[in-house]
């Protein structure tokens, strides 16, 4: 029966992680909701895992005293116990408001085979036995919490077990005699099993499951320099209909994590329970990512003449600029130009019902490439555009795509006189549409992972956009090995 305990991680971890100390108490950036439908699916999968596990274990030996008529009191031993077959019919996993989860298994039976010995001072009997255990019922309440590291905790707050019937058939030396007193043997067998089931479950929760939870990573790698923080901001919340797990959801630079000035907004989640799981993802998650990529310089770019299409009317040369910036051509005749773009502040994604948008602002500095290989600054442009964003999610991650609008260019500073900066809009539009945004869309296509266990996939996906957050709904399929 120890497998009942060892199979608990298969049931629970598929729910708890379907997963910084200073973040405790803050608003979550990401919430995972497991509905009653999802809990029942987890119970079903857990029952299958348990049934498979039971057939691979050896039960512990147990001994005791037995009074045999005409022989007297002897010492019995049941050993080499193996589960030959099992049938687990019903299981349920329900939220317990304010506490955690209640796991129950009922109407189950197992058949155990093994060896027996009976010792008396002047003789020893031995043989084999076959035990049929019917009507097994187990109920365990699991208290869920979180520790300062942001990892989940679990304790078995209560446990009860019951066995309706035990039938023992013994063979071997005088096995027929012992079978005459099967009621006494079966009663002892039943008491031993009932007492050990909860003992082994509670031991497994404290010695196996809880230590395992402490090894779970609270960060997940996104790419070569960015990670996402999946630590819990508080203990999982259980209500009558669901279990909700709150994650920090901050994306940060792996090598030098800086304090984030952004705050995650309070998310008012829709009361939806039709799917197995839901994920609420705050704009905080995406905007902390923007801060990291801005800090890394990922948003900076440069444009040189060899990047301009051959049929362009404007080249990045002082000669090409002569018609509208004549002073530039006079001061720097027949020289090439380089445009260096940067984003002064990280662009923030705006969520409104049914819509995603971002309004990036860029500055572009123009340099003349001197014969000495040095660069001479000559003017600065400001570039504004509005961008619509599309986010989707698949079986394991969220991906995105940016669609930019038309750019608007203004001259901010100039050492070569005033000129109409709008003449550069066509050139900048070409670069932004064909190089700058494709680079970002390639990164967004890589996506960032949802807090799922291995071999867990999502299907029947649905996406809603609310103020300040995305709301994703899905059903779950566990891919068995």
Curated annotation (Swiss-Prot):
Disulfide bonds join 159-198. The keyword Secreted applies. Residues 1-25 form the signal peptide. GO terms for molecular function: coreceptor activity; lipopeptide binding; lipopolysaccharide binding; lipoteichoic acid binding; signaling receptor binding. Its main location: secreted. It comes from the Eukaryota. Detected in blood serum (at protein level). Keywords: Antibiotic, Antimicrobial, Disulfide bond, Glycoprotein, Immunity, Innate immunity, Lipid transport, Membrane, Secreted, Signal, Transport. One of its GO terms (cellular component) is extracellular exosome. One of its GO terms (biological process) is positive regulation of neutrophil chemotaxis. InterPro entries: Bactericidal_perm-incr_a/b_dom (IPR017943), BPI/LBP (IPR030675), BPI/LBP/Plunc (IPR032942), Lipid-bd_serum_glycop_C (IPR001124), Lipid-bd_serum_glycop_CS (IPR017954), Lipid-bd_serum_glycop_N (IPR017942). It is found in: Secreted; Cytoplasmic granule membrane. SUPFAM superfamilies: Bactericidal permeability-increasing protein, BPI (SSF55394). Glycans are attached at residues 300, 355, 386, 394. Plays a role in the innate immune response. Binds to the lipid A moiety of bacterial lipopolysaccharides (LPS), a glycolipid present in the outer membrane of all Gram-negative bacteria. Acts as an affinity enhancer for CD14, facilitating its association with LPS. Promotes the release of cytokines in response to bacterial lipopolysaccharide. Belongs to the BPI/LBP/Plunc superfamily. BPI/LBP family. When bound to LPS, interacts (via C-terminus) with soluble and membrane-bound CD14. This is Lipopolysaccharide-binding protein.
